């Protein structure tokens, strides 16, 4: 009883809302238009892009950020970033080059050309307020001699050039890999500076004879003042221009560059590239909506209502964008999906309202028809809009650890709210005016009076076709004009009969088993998309640089800083063995290993604290080949003696081309050791900030959204008229969600911020389209399930087809935007629409004929009502016979009357 009361109360509320809108159409048309003008004007004036890529795509809360703060407090990262090599996420300002020998050549034979490029970079000038700045003014300085810090590969190539100039070959310069000894005696790790190395099979000393590429990084100071950063930014811009020119002019070298702003530039480039495609998408959706809303009936066709519906959602999106920027929001390229997602939800409400209008009785006044359409449609549309807000609201909650996902979900919630208001206000007003025109028999396109039948009979055929309403004027109130819509006609006359055919059902079951098996297979192969390349423009310099880097410089992992942040007894043999165990399997760049090697060479023992620290400070750190280790140790003076309170060393692991996955494994292996080990240490690399707990962070929004929807649908079991509707909706949405997840994985889509947002949208898109379909079936009172599913398809099939076709047509232009982000958005959106249509038109119509709810009780009720009516007719007949007998027996009385 409570369920019926709630349902009737909601329908009555929306009926009165429809009446209110129909009585004040000008007000509800004007207010949204004024709001759009007010908020839309702020889009251009307050538009600001988000410039910090780390804020957007890195997990907001992670141990890596805490470890970075601790490491930076001990050893400033800006001073040691040249040792903490990271492939794409080097902190601060910098410029990086990859020089690749063309035609498979040996880069070691091109030392002169490499050094010429290097010299041009050093000589490049940047003008700021009349002063010229070069790299020497901006570079990171070495502590020992205050000279610019350069990669050791430059020193090696200078030695090779000198050897060539002295009529020797480059092979005379000993270059080992990955560790090589320089002329000053220092041992340097060049695994990330020399790439594509081929070592002879019988080469015991690892001497390099052939290499394909070198990588040079120019580190800039980060002093803090705004002026310094502006000059550094200008230097990076000029650096990119210079490299582009050198790459064009060079015949022997293929040159690529990367700077600190390159990733952001190519991430933001997606939004710039997609401008024209978004406009094309809008035009295509307008055409599709107009055509799909048309009928041959010029009185009831109303193609402009489809067009006005799309325009309603467009101005709603403009208003939502204005609200976003007024609240200090910053644009990023992931927000590109909001117009498409909002259009997919908004046009569903528009087409359902249009279908509801056409189902109303034409004999009613147009205001009551609008109210009936609201009562018929807005209950379900309100429910699905509420679920949109709940799911995306959970995505915007503190449980979400990715800022780009949180910003997107917040914006989507605002867009859905504004869409909902505009659909019942602006579009409701359009429906009122269209109804008034229809009631006064005005043409749906030309807005002129439709001539009488007698007048049309005297006109040519083309005029009759354009001006005829397609119905006999004397009988059009008794017909159902909506059934003449071409989609409705196809569903009623052809599709419903075919899909419910007994011989079709086995093939549908087989199709679903194939669908489920492929989905399950894909779900077992899910991989996280922590690689930032998935979000960049596909033909951008950053993507080309990253692919070259992965091909030639992926033999070794990023350099992992190993920071010991508490005093330990370095002179103790047990501690030394412990440190060796921790670094086992890594290529180490360690002051302590070099110190023990130094002690062995000079044949000195340092088994006590005083000897260990005394020799370390007075001999080891003053030797030219070991001076660079001064920055790796922090001493404290306690009275007359010194203590080592912290130190660091660097670890590098051997990897394959799947570097990112292996780095995540390294982090997961080392971090637990730091928590349970007696030596208190942390490990850090700038890449860890983007990779630490990324998988769990990116999955949590869809888990919280899915759990919230499941909870809501279960809690409302006792509030809806038939709980089986909720049960079927849960099963259907789960099937669609898992199908999209599995199939997108098979389509090479990783779990990144875009794909996870698409999965949240899939939940809502499936509910938006399946809920009216399922509830109509559950509440139908026909004799059989087959008849009920036919009625459900006839009522909602046209709106589902109209909306999904407009949605798919709208996302098609995204395929032509050269960006990995839009490719992901297109793939996931296409799978979402495809799986939803498959369930609405193929799987559900067949499976609902097998399983509950049963329609026998309705059949029994109808049989009982029919028997009751037969009894009433029998009694009526008996009364008539008695009256006839009385009339025959008393004719005089009848005559007198």
Swiss-Prot record:
Q: Which domain of life is it from?
A: Eukaryota
Disulfide-bonded cysteine pairs: these are none
- Domain SSD: start-end pairs: 273-433
Quote the Pfam families the UniProt record gives.
Answer: Patched
Q: Where is the composition biased (Basic and acidic residues)?
A: 867-881
Q: Does the keyword Glycoprotein apply?
A: yes
Keyword Electron transport attached: no
* Protein name in UniProt: Patched domain-containing protein 1
Q: Which organism is it from?
A: Danio rerio (Zebrafish)
């Amino acid at each position: 009883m409570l369920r019926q009361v709630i349902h009737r109360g909601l329908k009555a509320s929306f009926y009165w809302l429809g009446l209110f809108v129909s009585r004040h159409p000008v007000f509800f048309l004007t207010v949204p238009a004024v709001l759009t003008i007010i908020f839309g004007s702020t889009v251009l004036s307050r538009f600001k892009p988000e410039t910090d890529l780390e804020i957007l795509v890195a997990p907001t809360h992670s141990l890596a950020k805490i470890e970075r703060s601790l490491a930076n407090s001990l050893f400033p990262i800006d001073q040691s970033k040249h040792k903490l090599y990271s492939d794409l996420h080097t902190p601060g300002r910098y410029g990086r080059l990859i020089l690749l020998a063309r035609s498979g050549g040996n880069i070691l034979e091109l030392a002169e050309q490499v050094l010429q490029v290097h010299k041009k970079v050093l000589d490049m000038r940047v003008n700021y307020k009349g002063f010229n700045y070069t790299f020497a003014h901006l570079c990171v300085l070495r502590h020992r001699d205050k000279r610019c810090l350069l990669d050791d590969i430059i020193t090696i190539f200078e030695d090779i050039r000198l050897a060539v100039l002295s009529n020797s070959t480059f092979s005379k310069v000993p270059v080992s890999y990955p560790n090589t000894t320089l002329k000053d005696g220092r041992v340097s790790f060049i695994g990330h500076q020399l790439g594509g190395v081929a070592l002879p099979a019988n080469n015991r000393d690892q001497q390099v004879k052939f290499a394909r590429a070198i990588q040079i990084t120019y580190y800039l100071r980060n002093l803090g003042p705004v002026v310094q950063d502006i000059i550094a930014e200008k230097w990076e811009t000029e650096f990119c221009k210079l490299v582009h020119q050198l790459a064009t002019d060079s015949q022997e070298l293929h040159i690529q560059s990367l700077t600190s702003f390159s990733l952001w530039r190519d991430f933001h480039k997606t939004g710039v590239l997609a401008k024209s495609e978004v406009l094309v998408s809008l035009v295509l959706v307008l055409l599709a909506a107009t055509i799909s809303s048309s009928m041959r009936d010029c009185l009831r066709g109303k193609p402009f209502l489809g067009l006005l519906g799309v325009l309603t959602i467009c101005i709603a999106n403009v208003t939502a964008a204005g609200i976003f920027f007024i609240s200090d929001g910053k644009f990023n390229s992931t927000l590109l999906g909001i117009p498409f997602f909002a259009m997919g939800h908004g046009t569903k409400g528009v087409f359902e309202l249009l279908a509801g209008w056409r189902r109303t009785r034409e004999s009613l006044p147009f205001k009551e028809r609008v109210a009936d359409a609201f009562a018929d449609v807005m209950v379900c549309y309100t429910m699905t809009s509420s679920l949109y807000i709940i799911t995306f609201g959970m995505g915007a909650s503190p449980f979400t650890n990715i800022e780009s996902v949180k910003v997107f979900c917040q914006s989507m919630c605002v867009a859905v709210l504004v869409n909902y208001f505009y659909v019942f206000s602006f579009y409701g007003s359009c429906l009122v005016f269209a109804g008034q025109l229809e009631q006064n028999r005005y043409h749906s396109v030309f807005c002129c009076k439709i001539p009488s039948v007698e007048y049309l009979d005297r006109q040519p055929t083309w005029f009759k076709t354009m001006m005829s309403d397609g119905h006999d004027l004397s009988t059009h109130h008794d017909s159902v004009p909506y059934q003449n819509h071409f989609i409705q006609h196809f569903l009623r006359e052809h599709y419903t009969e075919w899909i419910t055919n007994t011989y079709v059902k086995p093939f549908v079951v087989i199709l679903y088993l194939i669908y489920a098996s492929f989905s399950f297979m894909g779900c077992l192969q899910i991989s996280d998309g922590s690689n930032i390349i998935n979000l960049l423009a596909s033909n951008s310099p950053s993507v080309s640089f990253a692919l070259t880097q992965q091909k030639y410089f992926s033999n070794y992992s990023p350099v992992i800083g190993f920071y010991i942040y508490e005093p330990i007894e370095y002179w103790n043999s047990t501690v030394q063995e412990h440190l060796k165990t921790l670094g086992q399997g890594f290529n180490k760049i360690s002051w302590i290993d070099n110190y023990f090697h130094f002690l062995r060479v000079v044949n000195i023992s340092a088994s006590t604290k005083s000897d260990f620290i005394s020799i370390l400070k007075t001999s080891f750190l003053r030797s030219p080949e070991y001076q660079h280790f001064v920055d790796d140790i922090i001493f404290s003076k306690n009275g007359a003696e010194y203590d080592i309170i912290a130190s660091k060393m660097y670890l590098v692991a051997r990897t394959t081309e799947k570097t990112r996955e292996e780095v995540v494994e390294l982090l997961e292996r080392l971090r637990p050791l730091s928590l349970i080990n007696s030596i208190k240490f942390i490990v850090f690399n700038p890449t860890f900030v983007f990779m630490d707990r990324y998988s769990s962070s990116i999955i949590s929004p869809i888990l919280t959204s899915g759990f919230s929807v499941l909870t809501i649908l279960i809690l409302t079991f006792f509030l809806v008229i038939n709980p089986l509707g909720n049960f079927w909706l849960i099963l259907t949405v789960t099937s669609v969600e898992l199908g999209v997840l599995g199939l997108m994985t098979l389509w090479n889509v990783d779990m990144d911020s875009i794909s996870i947002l698409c999965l949240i949208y899939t939940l809502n898109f499936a509910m938006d389209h399946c809920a009216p379909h399922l509830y109509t079936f559950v509440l139908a009172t026909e004799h059989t399930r087959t008849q009920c599913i036919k009625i459900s398809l006839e009522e909602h099939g046209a709106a589902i087809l109209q909306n999904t076709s407009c949605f798919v047509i709208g996302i098609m232009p995204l395929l032509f935007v050269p960006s990995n982000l839009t490719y992901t958005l297109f793939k996931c959106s296409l799978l979402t629409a495809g799986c939803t249509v498959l369930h609405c038109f193929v799987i559900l119509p067949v499976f609902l004929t097998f399983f509950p709810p049963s329609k026998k009780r309705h059949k029994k009720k109808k049989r009982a009502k029919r028997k009751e009516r037969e009894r009433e007719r029998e009694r009526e007949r008996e009364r008539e016979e008695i009256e006839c007998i009385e009339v025959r027996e008393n004719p005089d009385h009848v005559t007198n009357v």
